[in-house]
From Swiss-Prot:
Described function: Hydrolyzes ribosome-free peptidyl-tRNAs (with 1 or more amino acids incorporated), which drop off the ribosome during protein synthesis, or as a result of ribosome stalling. Catalyzes the release of premature peptidyl moieties from peptidyl-tRNA molecules trapped in stalled 50S ribosomal subunits, and thus maintains levels of free tRNAs and 50S ribosomes.
Site (Stabilizes the basic form of H active site to accept a proton): 91
Keyword Transmembrane helix attributed: no
UniProt name for this protein: Peptidyl-tRNA hydrolase
Keywords: Cytoplasm, Hydrolase, RNA-binding, tRNA-binding
Active site feature: 19
Subcellular location: Cytoplasm
Lineage top rank: taxon: Bacteria
Biological process, per Gene Ontology: protein quality control for misfolded or incompletely synthesized proteins; rescue of stalled ribosome
GO molecular function, one term: tRNA binding
Gene: pth
Reaction it catalyzes: an N-acyl-L-alpha-aminoacyl-tRNA + H2O = an N-acyl-L-amino acid + a tRNA + H(+)
Cited InterPro entries: Pept_tRNA_hydro, Pept_tRNA_hydro_CS, Pept_tRNA_hydro_sf
Assembly mode: Monomer.
Length: 190
């Protein structure tokens, strides 16, 4: 069993915002693999699907980005999962818009949702799939930028990034993090 966590903020006002790209990928993954309708559990919405005969739980914490760790910890404890069974999908300001990068482990890189997950799990040893949203224009506050909606051009780039992220996630489930990194990090570029 694997746990895929899409990070974002709950509520319609955050739909299609840069910070919610993790939710967008999670939703696309559940649609692609005909997952179960989401149920409310672990302070999040969780669906179940099968990828390459592996049971995959797809969790979207409803605690807001900065408190995502408590939801992830509850799901991990309930299903008795190890950090190697988890993939967290989130936005990254330090990657160009639409670029996808999978990592085996590492620091939060300033991403507040990842910071909270590291705090709750007591470890950085879990995979993360980061999707570039680029840097804010001059004079923009970072918070306004990440909570802002994608413009039309960005949304087109994100549609490709979402497909690429779903492919990379399926490879991670079926073939492991090393194979997924080798196959999808090189192919990502915009």
């Amino acid at each position: 069993m694997k746990l895929v966590v899409g990070l974002g903020n709950p509520g319609r006002k955050y739909d299609q915002t840069r910070h919610n790209i993790g939710f967008m990928v999670a939703d696309a993954l559940v649609r692609r693999y005909v997952g179960s309708p989401p149920t409310t559990k672990f302070e999040g919405e969780i669906s179940e699907c099968r990828i390459e005969n592996e049971k995959v739980l797809v969790l979207c914490p409803q605690t807001y980005m900065n408190a995502s760790g408590q939801s992830v910890r509850k799901a991990m404890d309930f299903y008795k999962l190890s950090p190697e069974d988890i993939l967290v999908i989130c936005d990254d300001l330090n990657l160009e818009t639409g670029r996808v990068r999978l990592r085996r482990s590492g620091s939060a890189g300033g991403q507040k949702g990842l910071v909270d997950i590291i705090r709750h799990l007591g470890s950085e040893q879990w995979a993360r799939l980061k999707i570039g949203i680029g840097r804010p224009p001059a004079k923009w506050q970072v918070s306004d930028y990440v909570l802002g909606k994608f413009d039309k051009t960005e949304l087109e780039e994100m549609e490709h990034a979402i497909v690429h992220s779903c492919d990379a996630t399926a490879c991670w489930v079926a073939d492991g993090v090393t194979e997924a990194m080798n196959r999808y990090n090189a192919a990502s570029g915009t």
